[in-house]
Amino acid sequence: MPANSALRRITKKALYSLLGDSSYKYFQAASKAMDIRNGSWSEPELELIPFAIRPGETALDLGANFGLYSYHISRALGAAGRVYAFEPVPFTFETLQLVAKILRFKNVTRFEKGCGEKAGKISFEVPVQASGAFAAGQAYIGGRRDDREGKETQVRWASTREVVCEVIRLDDFLPEINELSLIKCDIEGAELFAFRGARKLIGKHLPTVICEINPWFLEGFGVRLEELTAFFFDQDYRLYHYRSQDGESALVPVETRDVVEDNYVFIHPQRLSRFASILVGGA
């Protein structure tokens, strides 16, 4: 059954109504683990992982959700490598733990925490689907202004549930990690806050950063797109968009003005050689 088929959505709604939160997570974990393993849940940028990292290095998965990126990064890093995965929402984290058990994550350290500019307890809003189940991948830090122009296309839920989660600063929480080569970040508009809290780590290691960028969500936090890209441009990073179609793959340079809602890749010149075979314009 495809990962987002109509039949599957109907099945999930029925099961959630029958099982409720506490038991539904077992079904959710089993189905997500199957999707991850067989590739029916995927993103094009997963193809960049073998370019970005080497066995034995370290990676961060911010907004780990149910472990899609953690799984693929873990396999590429090998037994000597390490993934640190952060997922603050309790239901999602519990499901991630089950997925990790099913898929036998060996080198993924998981934390029930979010990442931000300041440490503390923070309210998150978790969208609720028509079935009553959480839309876990769309949870966001409270305070984002969604009741504004553009809501019709960006807000795909009728209600949210508030949960209080712990947020840490990565510079304080993981000051001694070695060989940080990749950060994946997808936290629904709060990406710049996480990066500011990891300023020292990023400046020291200059990791490749795979980041979802949604300008509308950024604006909801009072952040301009230019502020996000400038954080990296000020450290000499370059911005790319990954295109993969009909067997052809390419990393294409992008200007800030051309950014729309999608995944993007920030790469420092020191790491460009790793991507030389797919870089448009060369390293």
What is each stretch, according to the model?
Residues 1-283:
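Phosphate/nucleotide-binding beta-alpha loop and adjacent structural elements of enzyme active sites
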